[in-house]
């Protein structure tokens, strides 16, 4: 029982660990001089020449942790939802979509920064744009994931309803943010910050509720045995 409780808490902590690694990547990658979709191909080449690719494994590990957290959410919600559990499955599908879209951009980033100033400007811009648009589309996956969390949690439980409702709101914000960016080419990601904050709160909440649920189960077993 103690080992199972420890493993459950460890799985729930994947969301918190994901945010830690994601923030590490964002802090290292936050550079006012970095090119965006409005930059010229030549400026992308010049920037790539002076900035070798960072620790891609950190971002890859962060994506794996996000997928694990999506599986944890699926498990909690699926246990409360009646068969066939379609809404809970949508949570898992959204997480898988978000992770897959982001990981798909890794080869483009590695080619761009490993070749440095040798890349043709048009090719360099295309590689950079692939990375940016991939991230924008990954927000759609995150939106599906949290939108499904909101629906399943409010209707069937499995997680606190306040957590489910706030997740649903953030899911809508993610979709609006992604749609606006994809339509205009802008690169503001306010909703992504809300997503990271929600994941932190959800991860800590699920870790705490694991202990509370186990204690309730023990008390119930003691009460049954005393009869």
Predicted segments, located by residue:
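Hydrophobic, aromatic-enriched alpha-helical segments typical of multi-pass transmembrane helices
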Residues: 1-227
């Amino acid at each position: 029982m103690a080992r199972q409780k420890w493993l459950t808490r460890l799985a729930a902590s994947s969301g918190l660990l994901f945010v830690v690694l994601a923030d590490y990547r964002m802090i290292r990658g936050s550079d006012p001089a970095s090119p965006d979709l409005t930059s010229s191909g030549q400026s992308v080449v010049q920037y790539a020449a002076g900035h070798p690719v960072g620790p891609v494994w950190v971002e890859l590990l962060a994506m794996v942790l996000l997928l694990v957290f999506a599986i944890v959410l699926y498990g909690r919600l699926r246990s409360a939802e009646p068969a066939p559990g379609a809404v809970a499955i949508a949570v898992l599908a959204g997480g898988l979509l978000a992770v897959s879209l982001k990981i798909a951009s890794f080869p483009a980033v590695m080619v761009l920064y490993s070749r440095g100033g040798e890349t043709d400007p048009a090719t360099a811009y295309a590689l950079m744009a692939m990375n940016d648009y991939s991230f924008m589309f990954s927000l759609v996956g995150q939106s599906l994931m949290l939108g499904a969390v909101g629906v399943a949690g409010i209707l069937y439980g499995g997680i606190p309803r306040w957590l489910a409702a706030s997740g649903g709101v953030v899911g809508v914000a993610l979709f609006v943010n992604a749609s606006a960016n994809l339509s205009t080419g802008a690169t503001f990601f306010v909703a992504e910050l809300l997503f990271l904050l929600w994941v932190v709160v959800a991860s800590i909440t699920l870790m705490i509720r694991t202990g509370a649920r186990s204690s309730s189960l023990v008390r119930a077993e003691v009460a049954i045995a005393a009869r």
